[in-house]
Amino acid sequence: MLHALLQPASAYAVVLDAGSSGTRAHVFRFQARPGHTPMLLAKPSVLKHSPGLSAFADQPAKAARQVEALIHWAQTLVPAGQRRDTPVVLLATAGLRLLAAQRGEAAAEAVLDACRPVLIDSQFLFRDDWAHILPGADEGAFAWAR
């Protein structure tokens, strides 16, 4: 038992970066040990689907289908036993910010609202507020993920 406590465990995180040209799923794998800072084990696995979610403003269900395809791919990388402990976030950037500016917040929120049920049903750890439009000032803080 002591040996198991000393062994670092793998932990995962899934970040959906919904940009203007497409949505990228980033699957991060960390070394996690209680009391230690998690360490990234390798470059994240990344898959991009185009176009950006804002292209589906008039058909939000298509945005949900795009997110669903990315989630299915991420599920192949995260062991089934770890999915419930793996957070998934959907961070929308320039495309949905522009949609909100041009057609109103409700148009952008409708796209996110269509995607939330996919994330809830994904087997990953998700809360509704983890799918949101990232303010431009905060976007730079996530540049390391690209």
Predicted regions and their residues:
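Nucleotide/phosphate-binding catalytic cleft detector across ATP-hydrolyzing
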Residues: 1-20, 26-146
